[in-house]
Amino acid sequence: MDPKTQQLRDRVKRFAIRVVRFVRTLPQTVDGQEIGRQLLRAGTGVSANYHATGRSRSRAEFVAKLGVVLEEADEAEHWVDVLHQANIGRGDDLQWLRDEAAQLRAIFRQSVKTARANHARTSARR
């Protein structure tokens, strides 16, 4: 595995772990717990689905799986923003999650764009 891929894999795993720890700190209210569950699913989904891209059997499958990672990153960012706007959760941890979710979404948006272009170029050569 190339070093950049491993670095990103480690980064998304760190994000998932921070999400898990953050969700544990949310208030035991209906809104805190429900939004926390949504964030937990999306935040850990970024890591799990990125890990799954390494098992892609084709370029098309890789592009599709990377698209799922982007969707999960986008959703995680959404739920973090909801928590922020609803004033639920601790400041520093929440701010780190907001920043990291936005950065991961941007990384995966560009990755999907690049992977699609590479796939189209490869498909056109055949």
Where are these regions (language model features)?
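Amphipathic alpha-helical assembly/interaction segments
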Residues: M1-R126
